[in-house]
């Protein structure tokens, strides 16, 4: 039987007892899910989104989580109109409504479909929902691993502002940013932040992938402009969505590439397999029969573990990345 399922089963049985005697967690834990944004017509969600929400809630209840990271495409297909758009309720609040999720904060970034609507409205919704945290198009988060001096920095990016939007049906690649000055400002901000980052783990997150074997493939703009920064400043991992599957890649510098775009759709395409350097791909899952999935990340004193979880509850793949060496 799958190890993840056995662990979850045992913890379910022991949960009433453990609730009274479990020591405080000594790891930072979060779920990363992308491309979960339902549909623009009733019931405004899909079976896959509902299945993911249910399994995320079960995972959070049993394993614990400090937050949920949204990797963009939060509302299909054209984002939201304003901060009072009913899609916030119908695609987010009413779907991720389990008791286990009610007090878990979400940290949000925008995807290409969000940019077809009003991203400022998604930012403004942060003042309406106690769970929804989207302070600006790009921003920095800092966490401390409980019961330790281990620190984690996360840089949430707007890759559409960096590279431009893309039409999923016409062009697979963003051609150029709408405002080159805004793109340069964001990249300059990130470079300065990474240069100054002293944390034990440094993560960067955006919607577009740097590397992907799937339908959209590597994002040339990010391979050119973002990838060199990850290597130069010893970034632990880059997290993304956009392609509707689950992938893990790792480059020769040890940077992990966590693609988690299976929150609402599944696409089996591997059309760009030859566009990714040999040896990078460690895991890919895009079965059309699957209900999708997400990643569960746990950061401790020595390593960061990443588990790819199918919405059925099955563990698909697990890997780990080491803590950055201290100066």
Swiss-Prot record:
Disulfide bonds join 163-221. The keyword Signal applies. Keywords: Disulfide bond, Glycoprotein, Hydrolase, Iron, Lysosome, Metal-binding, Signal. It is found in: Lysosome. InterPro entries: Acid_PPase, Calcineurin-like_PHP_ApaH, Metallo-depent_PP-like, Metallophosphoesterase_PAP. Fe cation 2 binds at residues 73, 112, 207, 242. Glycans are attached at residues 118, 149. SUPFAM superfamilies: Metallo-dependent phosphatases (SSF56300). Its EC number is 3.1.3.2. Binds 2 iron ions per subunit. One of its GO terms (cellular component) is extracellular space. Fe cation 1 binds at residues 35, 73, 76, 244. The keyword Cytoplasm does not apply. One of its GO terms (molecular function) is hydrolase activity. Residues 1-22 form the signal peptide. Characteristic constituent of osteoclasts and some mononuclear preosteoclasts. Preferentially expressed in skeletal tissues. Its cofactor is Fe cation. GO terms for biological process: bone morphogenesis; bone resorption; cellular response to zinc ion starvation; defense response to Gram-positive bacterium; multicellular organismal response to stress; negative regulation of cell adhesion; negative regulation of inflammatory response; negative regulation of interleukin-1 beta production. Exists either as monomer or, after proteolytic processing, as a dimer of two chains linked by disulfide bond(s). May play a role in the process of bone resorption. The osteoclastic trap acts on nucleotide tri- and diphosphates with higher affinity, compared with other substrates. This is Tartrate-resistant acid phosphatase type 5. It comes from Rattus norvegicus.
């Amino acid at each position: 039987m799958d190890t993840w399922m056995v662990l979850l089963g045992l913890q379910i049985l022991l949960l009433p007892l453990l609730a009274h005697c479990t020591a405080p967690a000594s790891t930072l834990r979060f779920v990363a899910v992308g491309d979960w944004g339902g549909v623009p017509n009733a019931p405004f969600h899909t079976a896959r989104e509902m299945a993911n929400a249910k399994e995320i809630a079960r995972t959070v209840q049993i394993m614990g989580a400090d937050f949920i990271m949204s990797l963009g495409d939060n509302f299909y297909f054209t984002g939201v109109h304003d901060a009072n758009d009913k899609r916030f309720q119908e695609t987010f609040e009413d779907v991720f409504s389990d008791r286990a999720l009610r007090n878990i904060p979400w940290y949000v970034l925008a995807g290409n479909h969000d940019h077809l609507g009003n991203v400022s409205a998604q930012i403004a919704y942060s003042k309406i929902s106690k769970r929804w945290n989207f302070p600006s198009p790009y921003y920095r988060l800092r966490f401390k691993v409980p019961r330790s001096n281990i620190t984690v920095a996360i840089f949430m990016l707007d890759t559409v502002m960096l590279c431009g939007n893309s039409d999923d049906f016409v062009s697979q690649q963003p051609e150029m940013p709408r405002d080159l000055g805004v793109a340069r400002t964001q990249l300059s901000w990130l470079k300065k932040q990474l240069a100054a980052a002293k944390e034990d783990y440094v993560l960067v997150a955006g919607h577009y992938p740097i590397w992907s074997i799937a339908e959209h493939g590597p994002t040339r703009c990010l391979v050119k402009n973002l990838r060199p920064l990850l290597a130069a400043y010893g970034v632990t991992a880059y997290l993304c969505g956009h392609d509707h599957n689950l992938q893990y890649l790792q480059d020769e510098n040890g940077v992990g590439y966590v693609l988690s775009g299976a929150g609402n759709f599944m696409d089996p395409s591997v059309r760009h397999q030859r566009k990714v350097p040999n040896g990078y791909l460690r895991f890919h899952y895009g079965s059309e029969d699957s209900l999708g999935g997400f990643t569960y990340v746990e950061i401790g004193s020595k390593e960061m573990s990443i588990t790819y979880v199918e919405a059925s509850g099955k563990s698909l793949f697990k890997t780990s990345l080491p803590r950055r060496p201290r100066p």
